[in-house]
Amino acid sequence: ACDVSIEGNDSMQFNTKSIVVDKTCKEFTINLKHTGKLPKAAMGHNVVVSKKSDESAVATDGMKAGLNNDYVKAGDERVIAHTSVIGGGETDSVTFDVSKLKEGEDYAFFCSFPGHWSIMKGTIELGS
């Protein structure tokens, strides 16, 4: 399948720590569902995809960007894909070109809401 569904909750947790992207897919979609009840201003979640080595800097720059920008710096070329920030009961998805992922590179997905990225994160890898 060329998509995955991820859930985030009010306890600052994703329900998965790793995503494998089938390298035969042209595009890959991440579907995010917030299973909690808290509003996005208090406990918002998104999914940001970047190289593992860029994760910390992308999250730090994202904090400065604010909620109106989904805690992602505008035009950040280190960001491969990201969803909007959503609150409890909401869903969002993002589709990206699989050619942006290179074999042998380490990729991460994380929530860039302030204070979340150190806990709400996992790995993304190309697989078959």
From Swiss-Prot:
Cu cation binds at H45, C111, H116, M120. Its cofactor is Cu cation. One of its GO terms (molecular function) is copper ion binding. Transfers electrons from cytochrome c551 to cytochrome oxidase. Transfers electrons from the tryptophan tryptophylquinone of the aromatic amine dehydrogenase heterotetramer. It is found in: Periplasm. It comes from Alcaligenes faecalis. This is Azurin. Pfam families: Copper-bind. GO terms for cellular component: periplasmic space. Residues 1-128 form the Plastocyanin-like domain. Keywords: Copper, Disulfide bond, Electron transport, Metal-binding, Periplasm, Transport. Its main location: periplasm. InterPro entries: Azurin, BlueCu_1, BlueCu_1_BS, Cu-binding_ET, Cupredoxin. Disulfide bonds join C2-C25. Binds 1 copper ion per subunit. Monomer. Interacts with the AAUA/AAUB heterotetramer complex. The keyword ATP-binding does not apply.
